[in-house]
């Protein structure tokens, strides 16, 4: 994550660093947050006020931590509270803790005048006080794991796919307290829900594409599916939008532009070498696209 004069990098357990963007000097590093990422780290850091917030959902340890962004010192650390209920007959976690890991990046929202850090882990979505790490509420979905998407917020609700296995898209009222599983889920859908690509909230509608190439438009307030159409290809990268169009990036290298409307319409398609696994970065009017073989900057001239 980048701000004026600084860039913050994390590789998960291998380390976290802060660099000066002008001098390239390393201002501080941390390598003492340890967990078994199992298949590698996937959660990005975020900034909130003077804090750099990190997520560690490993097979062995699961926690969220906040560092002072100026010094790298720990401000708070909070362990995940869900009971995974995944022990085998020998008292060991199933598949070495495979169901305990996660890859989601959190989001800070303002709801009812209160800041909440919305963080999706294995089997649960949590809300924390971003300044102290105190858990505010939790929604548990025990049959899902390896959540990879970032939540979105609007219309007084948090929207997020729950992860792999029996993944669903949930709409949650973030005004709860404690275990809110039975009280604060407003709607859910199981049809063509993405596991890896994050969802977009554009006005009154949620747009998403599942890993197998089915794109959907869903009414945010009700959960009613407006349309669901096969775009084709396989997907790991998250879509982006300019407010009028939604752009999907396939593992085969195809970019598909779809109208961000209630009626499904493909507006354009293009092809790049390699294929997309990483989500695009947007800088001013340009896209920074990383395929398996190339790094591209694309903008309108």
Where are the regions that the model predicts?
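Noncatalytic, solvent-exposed loop/strand surfaces
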Residues: 1-301
């Amino acid at each position: 994550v980048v701000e004026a004069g600084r860039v913050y990098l994390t590789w998960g357990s291998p380390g976290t660093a802060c660099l000066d963007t002008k001098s390239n000097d390393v201002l501080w590093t941390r390598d003492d947050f340890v967990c078994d990422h199992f298949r590698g780290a996937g959660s990005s850091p975020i900034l909130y006020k003077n804090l750099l917030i990190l997520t560690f959902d490993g097979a062995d340890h699961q926690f969220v931590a906040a560092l002072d962004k100026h010094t790298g010192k720990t401000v708070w650390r909070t362990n995940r509270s869900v009971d995974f209920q995944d022990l085998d007959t020998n008292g060991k976690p199933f598949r070495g803790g495979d169901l305990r890991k996660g890859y989601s990046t959190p989001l800070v929202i303002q709801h009812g005048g209160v800041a909440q850090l919305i963080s999706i882990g294995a089997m649960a979505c949590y809300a924390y006080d971003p300044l102290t790490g105190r858990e505010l509420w939790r929604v548990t979905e025990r049959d899902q794991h390896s959540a990879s998407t970032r939540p979105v917020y609007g219309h007084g609700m948090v929207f997020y796919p729950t992860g792999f296995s029996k993944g669903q898209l949930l709409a949650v009222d973030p005004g709860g307290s404690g275990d809110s599983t039975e009280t604060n889920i407003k709607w859910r859908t199981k049809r063509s829900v993405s596991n890896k690509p994050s969802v977009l909230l554009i006005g009154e509608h949620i747009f998403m594409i599942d890993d197998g190439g089915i794109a959907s438009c869903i009414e945010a307030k009700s959960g009613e599916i407006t349309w669901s159409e096969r775009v084709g290809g396989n997907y790991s990268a998250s879509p982006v939008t300019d407010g009028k169009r939604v752009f999907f990036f396939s593992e085969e290298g195809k970019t598909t532009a779809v109208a961000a409307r209630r009626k499904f319409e493909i507006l354009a398609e293009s092809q790049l070498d390699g294929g997309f696994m990483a989500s695009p970065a947007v800088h001013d009017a340009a896209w920074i696209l990383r395929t398996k073989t190339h790094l591209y900057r694309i903008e309108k001239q």
